[in-house]
Regions:
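Basic, polyanion-binding surface patches
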Residues: 2-192
Length: 192
């Protein structure tokens, strides 16, 4: 029968969406010590803002609310162990977890937040809002910085060099984002 959907299984309400970015969110505490956490529920909110779901009980959330600034770095294939680690342990229980992960930080030149040197792409953000009921945090992107090692010939970020990872919420795996399959805002013109 035309229009009939075959071979489709229903799973109910799940947080299954691809790709799910792996963000490493970092902020300073009141003493100026860097803390970071792994966050997968987030993305671009508007043309100059990022939105992330962060529970109020996280140390990183507390630090962001106090400092009004944070960074968001893309987790990469080369740093998967360290990126997973900062999501496994709490900064409340392991105050030196950034160091234990093997990360080194420098202060952003644009906001009062740490840039993790081992993660080559970072969004440097000012806090815009946080809703404790929904755990939704919005940050204004003040700057995007990238290590020169991940830049292509066009002097822009090259995904093949960056090798960002995505989280598979179904199987609890990390995967590297894949190959180029087309040209945005271009390939669809063939159907006009």
């Amino acid at each position: 029968m035309k229009g009939e959907i075959k071979m489709r299984k229903n799973f109910g309400v799940k947080t299954w969406l691809y790709p799910m970015p792996v963000f490493i969110v970092a902020a300073y505490d009141e003493e100026g010590k860097a803390n970071a956490m792994n966050a997968a529920w987030g993305g671009i909110y508007t043309d100059n803002m990022v939105g992330i779901c962060l529970a109020e009980e996280h140390q990183t959330t507390h630090n962001i609310l106090a400092s009004k600034a944070f960074t968001v770095s893309m987790a990469t294939a080369g740093q998967v162990v360290a990126c997973d680690y900062v999501g496994l342990v709490s900064g409340k229980k392991v105050p030196d977890k950034v160091e234990k992960a093997g990360f080194h930080t420098v202060k952003s030149a644009f906001v009062n937040a740490p840039v993790i040197e081992e993660l080559p792409m970072t969004l440097e953000c000012e806090l815009v809002s946080y809703d404790p009921e929904t755990c939704h945090m919005v940050g204004r992107i003040v700057n995007v910085s990238a290590d020169e090692t991940v830049l292509g010939e066009d002097d822009k970020i090259d995904l093949d060099k960056l090798r960002p990872i995505t989280y598979d919420p179904i199987h609890h795996h990390y995967r590297v984002l894949g190959e180029k399959v087309g040209n945005a805002f271009s390939d669809g013109k063939s159907l006009k």
